[in-house]
Amino acid sequence: MLLKMSDLETERLRMREFCSSDASAVARWEPSFRADAFLEFCRHSYREWSMGPWAMLLKESGSLVGNCGFCRIDYDRSTDKLEYCGEVNYYVAPQYRGAGLATEALRSVMRFGFEEIRLTRIQGRCAPENVASEHVLQNAGLKFDRMIAAAQSGSPDERLYAISREDFQCSTLSKP
């Protein structure tokens, strides 16, 4: 599968690849956040898979407020056909949370995944106690799929949410 990452735009956000000049803004997100390691991960993702997290910038101010993108694209193991499933993740800096930016970005990423990459399914995970992240997934149109036990994922129990391309296309979410 050949992937090509494009810039995305929403009502309030411009989304693009991360670059070295983003380091100081990324470092301000959280005191413990390792901006250098994150940006190296981004460069590796773009180089190896032509895909990675999009930087989320407010159109109004140009402020870098978070990231959203695919952390994995793999065969969809829920079917016996050769189809692709994308797993999404997102992060919004604390001072920008609660404004719907993650949901807005996620919907744009999902549209790109279904329309440009031709994914058949998109899924996202969250810890059961992370109610805000669960709301982002729900507000973006994903439905609860199942619990993933710690033994399966290698991390604490997680709630898996998913949406199929057909369900996305039938919803109002597929419209920009």
Enumerate the predicted regions with their spans.
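A generic structural signal for short
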Residues: 81, 98, 121-122
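Conserved GNAT acetyl-CoA-binding A-motif
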Residues: 116-125
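Conserved beta-strand-loop-alpha-helix junction that forms the acyl-donor binding cleft
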Residues: 124-134, 152
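Conserved acetyl-CoA-binding loop-helix of GNAT-fold acetyltransferases
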Residues: 98-115, 131-139
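GNAT-family acyltransferases
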Residues: 1-95, 108, 112, 116, ...
